[in-house]
Amino acid sequence: MAETKIIYHMDEEETPYLVKLPVAPERVTLADFKNVLSNRPVHAYKFFFKSMDQDFGVVKEEIFDDNAKLPCFNGRVVSWLVLVEGAHSDAGSQGTDSHTDLPPPLERTGGIGDSRSPSFQPDVASSRDGMDNETGTESMVSHRRDRARRRNREEAARTNGHPRGDRRRDVGLPPDSASTALSSELESSSFVDSDEDDSTSRLSSSTEQSTSSRLIRKHKRRRRKQRLRQADRASSFSSMTDSTMSLNIITVTLNMERHHFLGICIVGQSNDRGDGGIYIGSIMKGGAVAADGRIEPGDMLLQVNDVNFENMSNDDAVRVLREIVSQTGPISLTVAKCWDPTPRSYFTVPRPDPVRPIDPAAWLSHTAALTGALPRPQLEEAPLTVESDMNTVVRVMQLPDSGLEIRDRMWLKITIANAVIGADVVDWLYTHVEGFKERREARKYASSLLKHGFLRHTVNKITFSEQCYYVFGDLCSNLATLNLNSGSSGTSDQDTLAPLPHPAAPWPLGQGYPYQYPGPPPCFPPAYQDPGFSYGSGSTGSQQSEGSKSSGSTRNTLRPPACEKERRAAGSGDSDSESDHTAPSGVGSSWRERPADQLSRGSSPRSQASSYAPGLPPPHPTTKAYTVVGGPPGGPPVRELAAVPPELTGSRQSFQKAMGNPCEFFVDIM
């Protein structure tokens, strides 16, 4: 005999039911299926069956005609029973018992209404295992008895820690709720009073169906009355659930006259329990959605125009969306903003949540304003005008938040660091500096900045152009780029100053210092007389002829040959002349000699007194100069001027002239 297997799912129960009908698969009807379910309130359910559509493939088709043939796959029928909203039968009462007005339909289990953890398992399935052998009333009564026992055991651990005396005005969540009460799409009215009439727990199997339904309707009316009183308690529910993390739902109206296409790619989510909704996969440039900017990839599509997708399968939603897009006129899209696509835990904070990370810059400025430790400079508070100092204008222009784009730029494959475009400079001046009646005046001001050196062209052009790159060349920038070691290669000739010796330290021997030192007092031993030093009094020095011997000494071995010529020629004199030795102390430095008579003529008692070494008494007025003929120990040998080749003595007169007035003639050319 032919037999048909029907597998049907009840609400959100994970385990399906199997019944066998003694009817051939091609002849089974909805009436045959309802006859098997005589112990269930079939009039309170909608019947959906697995079917095949030519356009969309496998779909869930609703069949309500009792004489309609049921679609069959591989000799069996797959069905889903969905509770009808507002049904006041035993099944409707049982749905009321699970604390939801409208349980989420099976197709949308993965949508925004399902906020349970993956480990959540409803307890209703265990209480309905024997449903086939019971009447609808007996099943409801036994279910309520189990709930009453569990409520008595868990009375001490009520939701939110409210005491027993407050349970008339507080809400509670039964642990065996058949559907989630934590969904963000459910309002606070979903949480009903956990106290119920004791009479419903004492119903026996002899209770008539009408009596049970009347009691449930009375309880339902009372619950609706409480809904208005407890509407403001939803936000006070436990913060450990998703109830306080409701999604941000927005409605966007798009004008399709300006944009020819919608510009979205949709993605459908499905699992073993049904479809989970339509989501925005990606957004194409140039479309109406991209021009609006409020809809982002990952948002869930809830409604298009007046068509709600909540109770639709993914295939039906796609079909409706295609029909609406093909029509003319504006399109309204209602979407739920997505959460963080990469959550670190199950409970995540929505992206539009007002809690934001701390901005360090804003925190620093706020703290400075409160403490007063970092007052804002007067430079930023005073408005800039055409009468302001150019240096001030340029410094404000260089601030990081000035609004002028200063960055590294490429020109002819050359990187120009911290450069600006001339047009940006003119626009910034015209916007931030008061007093310009038209942009042409701001351009003239920028040209004056270039002329005064505050702006500098890459190739040092003096005419201002708005298409050229410029860098800041003001004094502040130049000073900031200076380096004490810039240009020092170790072999270049530089004029530097040596450090003064410590007053308490003895004077070292055999070293040359660029200062005038007095002769030693008579009490000092002769060993103190360093051949490298000589002192000239202003009354005894005289210029001598070229045939005299040189009283100076040289210690430079890195001096260029031309400088060596001038040094040796200028250092000539006889044994009675005194020379003033001045030299830098850096590496690679040289001695510069000056005749004593020129020094004495241009000096004053004050200048002479300032040249004495610290820590030593000034010389006696009658003290004569100590002059040692010959070079210092370890230095090059000293030769007479006659022994110098004639070609090396030509610059003697010019060097002496330069030393006579060094402030006027000295030019250091490396």
Swiss-Prot record:
Record SMART domains: DAX, DEP, PDZ
InterPro entries per the UniProt record, alphabetical: DEP_dom, Dishevelled_C-dom, Dishevelled_fam, Dishevelled_protein_dom, DIX, DIX_dom_sf, Dsh/Dvl-rel, PDZ
Tissue expression profile of the protein: Expressed in thymus, heart, liver, kidney, brain, skeletal muscle, and pancreas.
Ranges of Basic and acidic residues composition bias in the record: 152-171
Biased composition (Basic residues): 142-151, 215-228
Span of the signal peptide: none
Residues in DIX domain copies: 1-85
Biased composition (Low complexity): 176-192, 201-214, 526-553, 600-614
UniProt domain PDZ: residue ranges: 251-323
CC annotations in GO: cytosol
Domain of life: Eukaryota
GO biological process: canonical Wnt signaling pathway; heart development; intracellular signal transduction
Residue span, DEP domain: 400-474
UniProt cross-references to CDD domains, sorted A to Z: DEP_dishevelled, PDZ_Dishevelled-like
PANTHER family, per database record: SEGMENT POLARITY PROTEIN DISHEVELLED (PTHR10878), SEGMENT POLARITY PROTEIN DISHEVELLED HOMOLOG DVL-1-RELATED (PTHR10878:SF5)
Stated role: May play a role in the signal transduction pathway mediated by multiple Wnt genes.
Miscellaneous information on this protein: Part of that gene may be located in interstitial deletions of chromosome 22 associated with DiGeorge syndrome (DGS).
Name of the protein in its database record: Putative segment polarity protein dishevelled homolog DVL1P1
